[in-house]
Amino acid sequence: IEITPLIEEELVLVQLRPPGLAEEPPPAPLPLAQVSGMPLVIPSRPNAIRMHVEAEMAALGVRPTIALEIDGVSAILDLVADGAGSALLSRHAVGSSVRPSSYSLRKIDPPLRTRVNLAISSQRPATLTQRATLDLIVEVCKRLGL
């Protein structure tokens, strides 16, 4: 398999923004061990982000406090907006939501990073159409700053 890295994103703690809360200066990063004690709205297993969060917390000897399990970023953000708990998502996921200003974002320490890679067979050569599509995907990710 030939693997091409596309995106590396940092996960942040997403919470309902209290009315009038200013984001300047941004709050200090929150220790991951402390995040584990907060009620989280998180995807159900098996989900790459869920598994990554659980593995990183396990390395610290803690487990996440799951408030709700639901799949889909928009559903997770709706539940956070309704006060059901906090979430661990990328800034891009929140920024592309319907109501990005409804949320407060806070960095985690140590940072949680996710990676998206493009995998293709190294034993079967890609067609010209496949190669053009792959090149376009890489170009779009770079252009978007992802």
Identify what each model region corresponds to.
Residues 3, 13-14, 40, 88, ...:
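Generic preference for hydrophobic
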Residues 15, 21-24, 29-32, 39-60, ...:
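Secondary-structure junction motif
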Residues 20-21, 104-146:
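A late-sequence structural motif
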Residues 46-104:
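Hydrophobic hinge/microswitch elements
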